[in-house]
C-alpha cells in the first residue's frame, strides 16, 4: 500500500467527498483584449493560448487556475502566482475555500476536466465553455495532508520534465506518459489501487 493510500484509508474511512467548484471558488473572466498586449510588458497576460503574452498593467494578484473559454478546451491550463492580466474570454478560478490546495486543484483539472466537458458535449468537439459548466465540475477533497503529498509527487515529475526537455525528447515522452499515468492514478479516488511495481531494489 502506498503512502497516499495509507493516508486516505486512515483519514477518510468513509471515502473521499467531492465538492463542486461553485462551493469552493470564485469563477470569472478578465476584461482585457489581445490588442492590449504590450511586447516586453512586466506582467503575464493570459489569453487563450498555451503560453501567456505580456502587458503593462495587471488586473489580479493571486493564485488561480486559468483556462480558456474558447479554443484548447481541456488542453490548456495555467496556474498563476502573483500579478497578471486576463483575456475577456479566459476564465479565472480562484479558490476561496480553506479545504483545497490550488496546486492540487490545478492537477485535478488537468487530469479530469476535459473528460467532464466531453461527457456533456452534444458533438464530438467542444469549441467553447461557459461559467455554469465550470461551476458544476466536481473536485475530490481529501484532507490537505493528502493533497500536499500528491502535489509533492506530481511537482517532482513536472520538474523532471522541465529538465529533460532540453536533453532527450524520447526520454521526455516516456516520462510524460509515466507522469500522466501516476497523475490519473493518484487522482482517481476509486476502489482499485494503482498497480505496484514488481521486483526489489
Regions found by a protein language model. Give the residues of each.
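Charged, alpha-helix-forming regions
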Residues: 1-201
Amino acid at each position: 500500500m502506498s503512502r497516499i493510500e495509507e493516508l486516505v484509508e486512515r483519514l477518510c474511512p468513509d471515502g473521499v467527498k467531492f465538492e463542486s467548484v461553485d462551493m469552493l471558488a470564485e469563477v470569472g473572466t478578465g476584461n482585457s483584449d489581445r490588442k492590449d498586449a504590450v511586447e516586453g510588458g512586466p506582467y503575464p497576460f493570459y489569453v487563450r493560448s498555451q503560453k501567456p503574452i505580456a502587458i503593462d498593467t495587471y488586473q489580479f494578484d493571486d493564485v488561480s487556475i486559468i483556462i480558456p473559454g474558447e479554443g484548447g478546451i481541456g488542453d490548456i491550463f495555467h496556474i498563476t502566482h502573483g500579478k497578471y492580466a486576463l483575456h475577456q474570454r479566459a476564465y479565472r478560478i480562484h479558490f476561496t475555500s480553506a479545504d483545497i490546495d490550488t496546486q492540487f486543484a490545478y492537477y485535478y483539472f488537468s487530469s479530469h476536466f476535459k473528460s467532464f466537458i466531453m461527457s456533456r458535449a452534444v458533438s464530438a468537439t467542444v469549441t467553447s465553455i461557459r461559467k455554469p459548466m465550470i461551476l458544476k465540475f466536481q473536485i475530490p477533497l481529501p484532507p490537505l495532508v493528502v493533497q500536499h503529498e500528491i502535489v509533492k509527487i506530481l511537482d517532482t515529475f513536472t520538474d523532471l520534465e522541465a529538465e529533460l526537455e532540453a536533453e532527450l525528447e524520447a526520454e521526455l515522452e516516456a516520462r510524460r506518459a509515466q507522469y500522466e499515468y501516476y497523475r490519473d492514478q493518484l487522482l482517481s479516488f476509486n476502489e482499485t489501487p494503482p498497480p505496484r511495481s514488481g521486483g526489489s531494489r
